[in-house]
Design a protein with these regions (language model features):
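A feature for loop-to-transmembrane-helix boundaries and adjacent hydrophobic helices
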Residues: 1-294
Length: 294
């Protein structure tokens, strides 16, 4: 299959809407819609959704951008730091994006301690994988993150790159992430919307990054220094996430206070207890007057 699709849907003046941007936005929109329904179904404050969206978008973009700059082209960006801000030039790393989302969720739950980190993280797994599947199709339209040359019947010739038939690894990844999203959602429903704390969060890291480690074997390296590595950068970055996923799945997170910000907040005292305490305080304040000794 010859793949020579225009990266831009349309352009007006100096503005151009790309397929990648549209699919990125579609992933965010679908994720937001799913989380909105979950908040409704599980009686969480809907008014907190806008803040959640803000945290997620900022965490994703900032994390993905910094991840690319630090892991794939560190010297280029350290010598010219202003380029880090030029997101429109391309260069986003999913490992950095995932890390950025985790940090964003921690900050969000510190701001709104009525929302548990793992309650939120577990339920965001399948929307996140759905969004990741959309983004990989965006990579396909950009003719980037493509695979090694191959003679399989479904090989793609990316005309913007060369005339060599290659593995369409963007499609492989998209199908994989969408499948993981479906599996996690099925588990969520089988558990009657009450999965064990941290179980889906741990599973998504194990499944997604184990799959990513495997798919990387079909991909071309993204930067030259990877040619001298036994494992490429995508695999090296995936392994810690898989290990952390097992750590979470087997309950190691219960000892990490950073994931339980609500525990450090003062709980609201029930009205009756507070009233009783006030009365007792008033009684203790009424002391019997005595004549001073002379």
């Amino acid at each position: 299959l010859i793949w020579d699709v225009n990266r831009e849907i349309f352009s007006i003046g100096g503005f151009a809407l790309r397929w990648y941007s549209l699919l990125f936005a579609l992933g965010i929109f679908l994720g937001y819609t799913i989380m909105y329904r979950i908040f409704q179904k599980e009686d969480k404050p809907i008014e907190l959704m806008d803040s959640l969206l803000f945290h997620i978008v900022i965490g994703t973009v900032v994390g993905a951008r910094l991840g690319h700059c630090l892991f794939y082209e560190p010297m280029d960006y350290l010598t010219n730091p202003i380029r880090i801000l030029k997101v429109w030039e391309g260069g986003l790393a999913s490992h950095g994006g995932f890390t950025g989302v985790i940090i964003a969720l921690i900050l969000y739950c510190r701001r709104y301690p009525q929302i548990s980190f793992f309650w939120l993280a577990d339920r965001m797994t399948f929307p996140a994988m759905l969004a990741a599947g959309c983004i990989r199709i965006g990579n396909l339209f950009n003719s980037e993150i493509y695979g090694h040359k191959t003679d399989v019947a479904w090989a793609f010739i990316f005309k913007k790159i060369d005339d060599i038939p290659r593995h369409p690894t963007q499609i492989y990844e998209s199908i994989g992430y969408l499948s993981i999203s479906a599996i996690l959602y099925i588990i969520y429903r089988l558990k009657d919307r009450k999965p064990t704390e941290g179980s889906l969060f741990g599973l998504v890291m194990i499944m997604a990054y184990s799959f990513r480690t495997y798919i990387e074997t079909f991909k071309e390296n993204q930067v030259a220094f990877e040619d001298n590595l036994t494992l490429n950068m995508g695999q090296l970055l995936s392994i810690p996430f898989v290990l952390f996923g097992f750590f979470i799945l087997f309950g190691g997170h219960r000892k990490l206070k950073i994931f339980h910000p609500g525990l450090t907040e003062f709980k609201k005292v029930p009205a009756k207890v507070e009233e009783k305490a006030t009365k007792n305080s008033g009684k203790s304040g009424k002391r019997k007057k005595t004549n001073p000794k002379t």
